[in-house]
Every structure is written in structure tokens, then in C-alpha cells.
Amino acid sequence: DQPRSRGLGDVYKRQNYGCFHSINTFDMADANTHFYELQDVPHGQVHICKYISAVNQHIKECYVYTPPGYDRHRDRNYPVLYLQHGVGENETGWVWQGRMQFIMDNLLYAGKCREMLVVMCSGYAFEPEEDPVFFPGDFDKELTESVIPFIEQEFRCIHNRWGRAVAGLSLGSAQATLSAGKHPELFSALGVFSGVGLRLFREYPMGQYMQIFLSCGSYEEELHKEQERCQAMLLAKGNSCFQKTYEGFHEWKVWRESLHDFVQLLFQNEELLQDNTIYLKKKTYTSDIFCMQTMEESMLFFDPVYKMVRFDVDEQGNPAGRYIDMPRGIHMLDEHSVEFNLYAPGADKVEVDVFDCGKLELSRSVQHEGYWTGILGNLEKGFHYVTFDVNGIRVVNPDAPVGYGCFQTINYIEVPEKDFKYPLLRDIPHGHVRMDYYTSSQTGRQKLCYVYTPPGYETGDKSYPVLYLQHGGGENEIGWLRQGKIANMADDLLTQGLMDEMIIVMNTGYAFREDGTSHGALSSFGEELVMDCIPYIDTMYRTMADREHRAMAGLSMGGMQTQRTVFEHTDLFAWAGIFSGGLVIRDEEVDYCDILLNPDKFRETFHMLYVASVSYTHLTLPTKRIV
């Protein structure tokens, strides 16, 4: 939830993934930040999609930007830019640090670039037990054998080299250069932002019709000289090559500007985009590592790599560093025991608290210098938040799954449940999860919601019912997706025929008006949902827009919001789910006796009211008495 505008010098802090860790970042606004800010313009969507790597058979996620109107213009095919992050970052980098989606929205609104898809993947593709080389890695195989076939199967793409471009920053630029050089038949343009792989231009002759864009920061002086030499060499060979230098260092300020200028050059020849023959085929794989992946996925990294980079150069001065393994912050040893590791070299005392399971004081590790370690057994199955204290100060473990809970960035652990396997990742058809922005009438701010669409939504034309699914107090719109693993569950239930196809919308439940008139606990989210979110979803998606095909559910606070919203808007909802949220018949604020104590009125109002609770919450006994 971000302000629609901000002033010079304003600082905006975030939790992102960088340097191979969960890490804090901040932005300072200046006079030239408008091009990557969230503006009041039509927004494209960012899809979160799953595919299987041809390199290691892991299920991985990629983020795919589709331009405004993509779903409406179903007769159009779009060119694709494959865009890679730098070392230590991952598939989320260009979305959260790079603001790619806002750069594209603003350029498209101004008519300065062509409509295109932008695909962002994690560039780490390691074989099991591999001693991987840092530069340039083997993402090329995953890109050409897994990612491109997947994208061209799932999205309406132009299937020729003139409809594909590849780019990246730092390490990602080396990976992009390697793929463009090895496969000139696949790509027509290459973007090298703060490129570290310029020697690859000498090893791989770029196709004569390859459009090449080089950029760097003004303080990357040696890199600038190398890029100028590289540009001269490429121009002499007949390539189209641009070189631009931006004020700055090896940093996101430079890379945002690079992307902004690069995409304006792409896909300008309409005639060359007409051939649309599919010749890259998607492969299928099997794997037994999906359970581990399920336990480790989080909001900052879907398929984490526990590595760091040891930088080095060879005798010729070329990059020759290697990846080195790092301990997992939380490591399941067996179905009941977990090992905890935290890097805190200057600490005197380190403690871990697994909610509902107990605390543990860690000891200095003998194997890993600077680390503290310990094992906790007899853990209850299921999901638990985890906190780490160093010398009595709460910290986030950057090498463990991270979510948002208890109104803070927080670690968590998932202990597998043998009798409840629906959340596990599987090699089955996967739906997409999209990021959507709408404006709240209650706060005047832009709101982000996540929207699950079932497999086949992209290529079909049918309409779907909608479930609005809310998180609990202290959590936010990402909770059901990462902690709750709702996309995995929906995929599995659909595959087994245990669930009807539906769209699932996940929102942040906080909508407090600036004048202080919102409900103190539940905020004005109910009003926002009814006035803003539902109309937006019904406009943007193929929904069955009536009460018979609209449901709402939530856990804890979200369950309370569900009852309040659904009972006050029975013209909009015929289905409701209250999970550990209590069920109110009448209190000092509301009176639902007319519905709940009148069987005929109840049956007329609801197709189903599903109320669930567990045995040890303060909400259980009142709920059971009411039911």
C-alpha cells in the first residue's frame, strides 16, 4: 500500500531480497523518480507462474508482466523481453527493487514503447551436488528449454526471434549475453546493464541483425571504457549498438534508467513480427524434491539457494569466482526435529522461539564460523512463526523463510503433515497468481491485491465464480499465498476434482480513513471491498458477477470482517467462511438475529455458511455454543 505521490527527499523502506539474504532497502525520492513511481495510469498485471527447470527439475516461479488490456485484446500476440537480475538477487528483484511494472505502465501510457510481456526468472540453475561457477552460470539451458517454451504455451506470444529480446543487470547481463550469443536464432535484441560479461562478445559472434544496448553508471569508469571498446567492435561488425552512461554507481538507479531507455528501442519493425510459428516444445519432468521446496518457499524467494559468492579473477583478469554453500537458517532434519542456524559473529547470546512449540538457546557452531546453531525436537505439525533474539534484540534470520505476521517481517517454519498434503507442490497444472492495483475510496491510496486464476484461464473464455479470501490480524495480502500456500492447495484440489474452478482474491484487510471514522479493529475494509475491489475484479476478470457465484472467507480478523461484510451485503454474497474468527449473533455493534435465528431466512440468504475453529482459541467456546 503506497502513497500515490511523494516529495523530494522522502525515504521509503522495504524488505527485499539481495546479497543472498532477506535485506532491508530504502529509496530516496529525487527530481527524476517519477518514471518508476506508481502513477494514476492504467496498470498492467504481474503474473506469478510456476514451471519446472530443465537443469535440476525444481519447480520455480517466474514473474510475468502483461500490459494493460492484455486480457481484453485476445486476438493480439505480444513480443517478450526476458529480463534477468544481478548476483545475490532473484526473480523478485526487477519487481520490488527495479519497479519494472511501473516503468512499463508509465511508458505505455505516454505512448513511448510497444506493448510487450516482460519475464523475470531466478537465474540460479544448479545441478545437485554441483560446485557451480559464479560466472556466467548455466541459466541458458533453463531459459531456452524450460522458460521460453513455458511462456509461449501459457501466454499469447510472438514465436520468432523478432519477437524476443533478452537483457539483464550485472550477472544477469552476462547470462543474457551468453544466451543471445549462443542462440542468435532466438533473440533479436540484447540489453547489457552494468555488464560484466563483455568478453562474451568476442567468444560468440552476435547475429548481424542483433540490436545491442550497453549501459553503465558514470562512476563505473573501467566498465565504461570496456563498453566503449565493445561498442566500437560491434559497430565494425555491422551490429546496431547503443551505449549510454547514467549518473550513478553499480546500483538500481542506473538499471531503472537503463530499462526505461532500452524498452523504447524494442520491437519496432511490425513486418518482422508477423511469423508466429511455434517450434520450442515444453518438456515434462518428475522430481522428489517438491516437499522440501514447499517447506522453504517464502514471499522473498520461491526456490531459495543457500549460497554466497567468492569473487575472484583468472590469470587474464576475467571473472572466475565460485558459489559457496551456506547453512540453511531453518533446516528440517526429520519429521519432528529442526536445526536452526543464525549468523551472528559478535553475539553473546542467541535464542530462537518457535511459536506454540518452545524456545531454544543456540550455541556457537563448530563447523561454520560466526554461526550459532541448535536443534529443537518434538515440534507440532503445521505452520509456526519463528523469532530470533540476539543479545535480547529481535532480528530476522535472512537465511530462513520470511513472511509478514504479527505486524512485522518474521520468519516461519512449516512442519509437514502426512495427513494433509494439499499444500505440497506437485508437477500438475498450475494456475497463475496476478498482482493487481486498484484505488481505495476509503483511504485514497493504491492497494495491491493478489488474484489466483485456475489453470486454463489464460487460454479459455469461460467465466468463473470468485472467492474473496482474507488474512488474519497482523498479516497482510501475502499471507494466504505464502504462509497459507493457497495456490498450491487450489492446484491440487482442482487436479483431484475436489474443488470447482474459481478465482481467488487476496487483499490487505487494513483500510483506515484519515479522519479516524473507521472501525477500530476491522477498519473500513468491508466498504472498500464492496465499493472498490469487487467492481475492479468484475471489470478486469471474467467473473460470474452475481451473489450466487461470489463468496468471502477469512481467518481470525479476516473471519470477523467476512461476517460483517457478508451479513451486511447479502445482495452480493451467498457463501461465507469464518475460520477461527468467531460467529456473532448479536453484540453492542450488530444484530444478526433476523438471519441466524430464522431458519427460512437463513436458507434464503446463504447457500453455505462454513464456520471452523480449533480446540484451543478464546473464540472456540462461544462459536461452538452459537453453532
Which functions belong to the PLM regions below?
Residues 1-8, 12, 618, 623-626:
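Single conserved hydrophobic/aromatic residue that forms the stacking wall/gate
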Residues 9, 13-23, 320, 331-333, ...:
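Aromatic-rich carbohydrate-binding modules that target alpha-glucans
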Residues 23, 28-71, 339, 414-458:
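N-terminal cap/lid segment of alpha/beta-hydrolase-fold proteins
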Residues 76-86, 450, 462-472:
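Short beta-strand element of the alpha/beta-hydrolase
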Residues 87-146, 150, 473-532, 536-539:
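Cap/lid segment of the alpha/beta-hydrolase catalytic domain
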Residues 160-206, 546-592:
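Primarily recognizes the serine-hydrolase "nucleophile elbow" in alpha/beta-hydrolase
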Residues 196-251, 584-619:
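The feature captures the conserved acid-bearing segment of alpha/beta-hydrolase catalytic domains
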Residues 220-286, 619, 625-627:
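C-terminal catalytic histidine-bearing segment of alpha/beta-hydrolase fold enzymes
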